[in-house]
């Protein structure tokens, strides 16, 4: 049972992927010749980024949560241009909605499931849709780190 003081620390939940998905993502990074590719062990999708800690139960299991994605450029908090693979995933959207129903906060107007491929692509531009079978390996949760930076 959590102590009341632990609920003020915030919550971060992310999805990690199967080895075959990680292989496909690394191949995509290589084929695009991405500068500053996110390392294999850091590839993930954020599900919850909440300044409020809620009693979220992480899920496990291995199943496909998306079969393709489109390349999108996001501006990061540090002002860099990140390249992400944005996905339509009913599963990830439902898990995010579950957290919101529990009272989780979210700093952005919409939840857009994605996997960051590079946190800094500079002035380069990328576009297109790519077939990448995204298979969930597990979810994990930890205390929200408001000091995290994509510069790390």
From Swiss-Prot:
What top-level branch of life does the organism fall under? Viruses
Positions contributing to 3',3'-cUAMP binding? 12, 74, 108, 142, 148
Which is one GO molecular function term here? hydrolase activity
Q: Which InterPro entries match?
A: Acb1-like_C, Cyclic_Pdiesterase
Q: Which reaction does it catalyse?
A: 3',3'-cUAMP + H2O = U[3'-5']pAp[3'] + H(+); 3',3',3'-c-tri-AMP + H2O = A[3'-5']pA[3'-5']pAp[3'] + H(+); 3',3',3'-cAAG + H2O = G[3'-5']pA[3'-5']pAp[3'] + H(+); 3',3',3'-cAAG + H2O = A[3'-5']pG[3'-5']pAp[3'] + H(+)
Q: Sorted alphabetically, which keywords does the UniProt record give?
A: Host-virus interaction, Hydrolase, Inhibition of host innate immune response by virus, Viral immunoevasion
Keyword Hydrolase belongs to the record? yes
> Which sites bind 3',3'-cGAMP?
12, 74, 108, 142, 148
Active-site residues (renumbered): 44, 46, 114, 116
> What biological-process GO terms show up in the record?
symbiont-mediated suppression of host innate immune response
Q: What does this protein do?
A: Counteracts the host CBASS antiviral defense system. Phosphodiesterase that enables metal-independent hydrolysis of the host cyclic di- and trinucleotide CBASS signals such as 3'3'-cGAMP, 3'3'cUA, and 3'3'3'-cAAA. Does not cleave cGG or cA4. Besides evasion of the CBASS system, might also enable evasion of the type III CRISPR systems that use cA3 signals.
Family label: Belongs to the anti-CBASS protein Acb1 family.
The protein, known as: Anti-CBASS protein Acb1
């Amino acid at each position: 049972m959590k102590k009341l003081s632990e609920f003020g620390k915030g919550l971060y939940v992310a999805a990690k992927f199967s080895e075959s998905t990680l292989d496909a993502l690394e191949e995509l990074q290589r084929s695009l010749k991405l500068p500053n590719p996110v390392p294999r062990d850091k590839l993930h999708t954020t599900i919850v980024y909440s300044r409020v800690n809620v009693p979220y139960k992480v899920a496990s299991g291995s199943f496909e949560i998306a079969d393709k994605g489109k390349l999108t450029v996001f501006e990061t908090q540090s002002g860099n241009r990140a390249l992400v693979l944005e996905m339509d995933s009913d599963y990830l959207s439902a898990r995010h909605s579950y957290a919101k129903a529990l009272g989780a906060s979210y700093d952005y107007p919409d939840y857009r499931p994605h996997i960051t491929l590079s946190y800094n692509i500079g002035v380069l531009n990328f576009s297109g849709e790519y077939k990448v079978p995204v298979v969930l390996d597990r979810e994990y949760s930890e205390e929200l780190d408001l000091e995290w930076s994509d510069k790390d």
